[in-house]
A protein has these predicted regions:
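Early extracytoplasmic/lumenal segment of secretory-pathway proteins
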Residues: 26-98, 225, 351
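Periplasmic solute-binding protein
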Residues: 93-104, 124-152, 180-191, 266-270
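Mature extracytoplasmic/periplasmic domains
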Residues: 263, 269-329
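Short beta-strand->loop
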Residues: 106-114, 129-130, 158, 236, ...
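Pocket-flanking alpha-helical
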Residues: 69-105, 114-125, 219-220, 239-247
């Protein structure tokens, strides 16, 4: 998931800067972990976990931020077999088939897979990648706004096109945003061949489109900033983030989640084919699904750990939403149609 704005700036400043590991009397072997731009800058407990990995193994981990998930995958495809790193983390199920088809990763069945939720392994049964976390992209709403206006909340994707919610929704462009792409996938999973008609209805109902999540959530959504739109495409785990990062302590979330609008995202890691340090890369992948690393995911990336033995923080239990039946699409179907879907969406919504 994306970071609150105060941390986004720090993360951007840290882009392409190696994260220093703990000092050692002997220079450790160094490997590179390629990540997306939501990975936190140094100084967090997640980075401290990587430092402990260095202490335990003697393997120094340099973190390189390669842009958003789509940009990261595109770079990895272009350098497949001659990678710019050793391990890549942050490939989600909307991009998984592309990574597999382009032979970006070496197959590896990580140590510790018995602790991973079985449903997360279904897409990578042959060791094509390793699931690290999951979450859901969902429509979020401004609780105070709806209470003040006395308007009943929308219940599902179809209701967002109702005139009751005219000019209330902001979404992200799927061509430039991971949650935007996930929301497009949710509409395709829900409406099938009728998804274009659905988006035409949303356009007629005044849907607003931002380039990315940060702009949508902080600039246009009324629940977190100066925006005037009380509905936004974000994450099922956004409400606990609002509690954790509130400038003034609060004991209840100010935003809510429409559980019947969600699309499931699973994030994977893999060993980049052509790495010069395959043994060290395997050790790092093993560590990424260990309880030691997984226990830091919730309050750093605001995602759910893939390791079923990890206990969630209370703020997640209290305020995050895990839908009972989130929308999904077969990664092969996504891979075959992604470009055409985005082009059709662009022609329908932006032109």
């Amino acid at each position: 998931m994306k970071y609150p704005r105060t941390l986004i700036a720090a993360a951007a400043a840290a882009a392409f800067v190696p994260v220093p590991a703990a000092a050692s009397s002997n220079p450790p072997t160094s490997i590179t972990l390629v990540v997306y731009d939501s990975f936190p800058p140094e100084g967090t407990s997640l980075n401290a976990a990587l430092d402990r990995f260095t202490d335990e193994t003697g393997i120094d981990v340099e973190v390189v931020v390669a842009g958003d998930a789509g940009t990261m995958v595109s770079k990895a495809v272009l350098t497949a077999g001659n990678p710019e790193g050793d391990v890549m983390f942050g490939v989600d199920n909307t991009y998984l088939s592309r990574v597999i088809d382009e032979d970006v990763f070496e197959r590896y069945e990580a140590s510790g897979l018995d602790a991973i939720a079985p449903e997360l392994l279904e897409l990578v049964a042959g060791g094509e990648a390793t699931p690290v976390d999951f979450g859901d992209v969902c429509v979020n709403y401004d609780i105070e706004w709806f209470e003040a206006e006395g308007i009943v909340l929308p219940t599902d994707l179809a209701s967002l096109a109702d005139p009751t919610y005219r000019d209330l929704l902001v979404v992200e462009n799927p061509a430039s945003s991971s949650p935007g792409l996930a929301f497009l996938m949710a509409s395709i999973a829900e409406f099938g061949d009728g998804w274009v008609d659905y988006w035409t209805e949303l356009v007629d109902n005044g849907v607003d489109v931002a380039d990315g999540w940060t702009e949508a959530y902080y600039d246009r959504f009324s629940g977190t900033g100066d925006g005037d739109r009380p509905l936004v495409v974000s994450y099922g785990s956004s409400p606990p983030a609002e509690v954790v990062f509130a400038e003034t302590p609060i004991d209840a979330a100010t935003t809510g989640v429409l559980a019947d609008t969600c699309f499931r995202q699973i994030e994977f890691a893999g060993i980049l084919r052509g790495t010069d340090s395959p043994d060290e890369a395997r050790q790092l992948v093993d560590f990424l699904i260990s309880a030691e690393f997984q226990s830091e995911l919730a309050l750093n990336l605001f995602v759910y750990p893939a390791n079923t033995g990890v206990e969630l923080p209370q703020v997640f239990t209290d305020f995050a939403v895990v839908p009972e039946d989130p929308a999904t699409l077969d990664p092969e179907v996504i891979a075959t149609n992604r470009a055409a879907w985005i082009e059709t969406w662009t022609n329908t919504v932006l032109r």
